[in-house]
Design a protein with these regions (language model features):
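Short beta-strand segments enriched in hydrophobic/aromatic residues
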Residues: 43, 99-101, 115, 130-131
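Short, cysteine-centered beta-strand-loop-beta hairpins and adjacent loop/turn segments enriched
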Residues: 74-77, 101-110
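Short beta-strand edge/turn micro-motifs at domain boundaries
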Residues: 2, 112-135
């Protein structure tokens, strides 16, 4: 089991950790659409997403994932995610960090959350956002 990895440290990253780090980089550099497209390019066709902002909704397949996040963007919602720790255990990559949701009305919420990325055969099978995991 690998221990925590500081975001931005590139030594000894597994391919799965690299996909996750590159997704957060794409979000900060190119926006939400770029991050989603990067992650989907490394996903199985039947990938499942359970976004933190999805109120329990489970998205299945790239089309549902794209439609959900396109709807967020088109509504004027801005999502900013910042990883603080990344840990790998087998085929799972766990990220603790913060998510800021800025609503078109001007209201916002910032939460400390965790993301879990489950890989199968080197491709993403499942991504979930939820309450922060203990470190």
């Amino acid at each position: 089991m690998a221990g925590p990895v500081e975001p931005g440290l590139d030594h000894a990253d597994s391919p799965n950790v690299r996909v996750v780090k590159d997704t957060f980089d794409a979000l900060s550099e190119g926006g939400l659409e770029a991050a989603i497209e990067h992650l989907l390019s490394h996903s199985h066709d039947d990938v499942e997403f359970a976004p933190y902002v999805g109120a329990g909704q489970v998205l299945r397949g790239a089309d549902e994932v794209r439609a959900f996040y396109r709807g967020q963007t088109e509504s004027g919602t801005v999502l900013t995610a910042r990883p603080s720790t990344i840990e790998e255990c087998g085929d799972e990559v766990f990220v603790n960090g913060s998510l800021r949701v800025l609503r078109p009305t001007g209201g916002f919420a910032e939460s400390q959350i965790s993301w879990t990325y489950r890989f199968r055969d080197g491709r993403l099978q499942e991504a979930r956002g939820g309450p922060r995991r203990a470190a």
